[in-house]
Amino acid sequence: MLSRLGARVLYCLAGLALLASGGCALMPREPLVQLPTTARAEPRPMGPATGSIFASSYAGNPLFEDRRPRNVGDILTIVITENVNATKNSGTNASRTGSTSMAFDAVPKALAGLFSSSSNASINGANALKASGGASAANTFNGTITVTVLEVLANGNLVVSGEKQLAINQGAEFIRFSGVVNPRTITGDNGVLSTQVADARIEYTAKGYIDEAQNMGWLQRFFLNVSPF
């Protein structure tokens, strides 16, 4: 009898331990930028020497052309200017009324207590619904980040991605960016606005005591996972 009771106690403790471990687990956060954040340019093969002064092999940008990114490994400055405002309002107003009346020539004895001395009955009903809701959001992100060309598409567009890390005291901040850039939108100072980048993904995260202070404690996560409400 005691052995069975001890086994049940062990099973209960094991179940509580599993629940506690599930409650303590952190929710995995998938990074928004999935592409590699850097790329190295492949070395070019040395062409045959055709002269003592001028070599006709391609060695970079032409002499009378701007130095703009066009190959894998080239760098580009992204000027982040994101201002997003969204507002949503909704409302519902509905009402319904109904009535029914009945008249009896004679009332059965079994129902005499319900109708007392009257042989008429009426039913009235009404319901109403009124609801409203609203939501608003405003996000502003300004800054610069230098990215690397990862791939040159068939139409000439550039797939870029990059990361910037900044450590301050016990905290670290990460800015990641990826997207597709049209070379025609690149300015003379080798920059492009983030609003002109297709499929742009901008991520700003941090690690440190400030980020930890914004996370829920392990006991709160435990009760949040086991609570049925």
From Swiss-Prot:
GO terms for cellular component: bacterial-type flagellum basal body, distal rod, L ring; cell outer membrane. GO terms for biological process: bacterial-type flagellum-dependent cell motility. It is a lipid-anchor. This is Flagellar L-ring protein. It comes from Cupriavidus pinatubonensis (strain JMP 134 / LMG 1197). The gene is flgH. NCBIfam families: PRK12697.1 (NF009337). InterPro entries: Flag_Lring. A lipid is attached at residue 24 (S-diacylglycerol cysteine). Assembles around the rod to form the L-ring and probably protects the motor/basal body from shearing forces during rotation. It is found in: Cell outer membrane; Bacterial flagellum basal body. It comes from the Bacteria. The lineage of its organism: Bacteria, Pseudomonadati, Pseudomonadota, Betaproteobacteria, Burkholderiales.
